[in-house]
Amino acid sequence: MEKQGRKLKKKFKIILVLVAILLIGIATLLGTYCYFKSPVSNDKKEVSIVIENGSTISDIAALLKKEGLIKDENFFKLYVKLKKVSNVYAAKYYFSPSMNLDEIINTLNEGGYNENEISITFKEGINMRGIAKLIKENTSNSEDDVYKKLKDEKYLNYAIEKYWFLTDDIKNSKIYYSLEGYLFPDTYRFNNKDVTVEEIFNKMLDQMEKELNKYKKQIENSKYSVHELITLASITQSEGYNEDDFKNIASVFYNRLKTGMALGSCVTSYYGVKKDMTDELLQKDIDASNPYNTRGNNPVSFPVGPISMPGAKALDATLDPIETSYYFFVSDKNNKLYFTKTLNEHERMITKLQNEGLWLEW
């Protein structure tokens, strides 16, 4: 009996070892699979490649690897087989190192560049008025088409249902433009000038969803609503000239909110009176009562909604914030920001800039 017990124990140990080896093997395979499927980098700069007639999957894999768009040629060829991609059309294609294998293969399946294709670049910090102008300039749509879609109740309900980050907050009647802040600024390609406003919006919302998915946990754990967070990100974007300042800018506004201070943001005053940032901001603009203005005699504690389209850096600064002791910042005429901890320090900094001829005056 004792012998049999020892044999059973030995067999059990062997089984455990085999199971452990199997699990390690599976984990290694999964890790390898995920690694080679993932993007090469976060670089969104597009690279154009031309696939010639008669190119094989091996030729395409070699070209993609050479341009730094995939991690491994053999894995790419294997993955293409798994996806059952048979024919790739000879054409010009656009890829970026930030695309994963699925996105690259989807692009190949779509058939590449066509001569009627249009490209529109929406820069970080652009507002809805700027987007409407660009859509008018580059497509068959008018600015009025854009504004009508922003008021289209049926479309807004559809968008709220489809995208987890859109809520009924965007339907507040005091908001100037319902999707302000939610259309991710980037370069987008469309088949031709007849693209609809809805198609443009959906593509931009799809990209915003990808960006915000990275911060879903932080958003869920925040004391602020997603609408408030996007609003803060838009203010951070509009206040900053240099992306390196975004983290400190966001921390200033978080610190002010914690202590009950007014946000006191000039960019909300501009937006509230529908002025561009290049316009002169008058005292009457600062004192104007509107649902966005956080300065003046009767400031709102929080703008009713976003004031621009925040990019990736501004979103990161707001959704993954740092802690500082800063409560103030001021810009010189060269767009350099100076951060300070107290009102006294802030006022001294302004005096210093004035004395040095660096103070920005209209």
Language-model segments: which ranges?
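Short N-terminal secondary-structure initiator segments
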Residues: 22-28, 44-58, 123-128, 264-280
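Signal peptide-directed extracytoplasmic domains
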Residues: 33, 37-208
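Bacterial extracytoplasmic/cell-wall-associated proteins, especially those involved in peptidoglycan
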Residues: 133-144, 155-362
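A generic short-segment signal for beta-strand/edge and adjacent turn/coil regions
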Residues: 15-20, 61-62, 87-90, 152-158, ...
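N-terminal type II signal-anchor transmembrane helix
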Residues: 5-44
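Short non-domain terminal segments
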Residues: 10, 93, 326-327
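N-terminal targeting leaders characterized by basic, low-complexity, disordered sequences
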Residues: 1-3
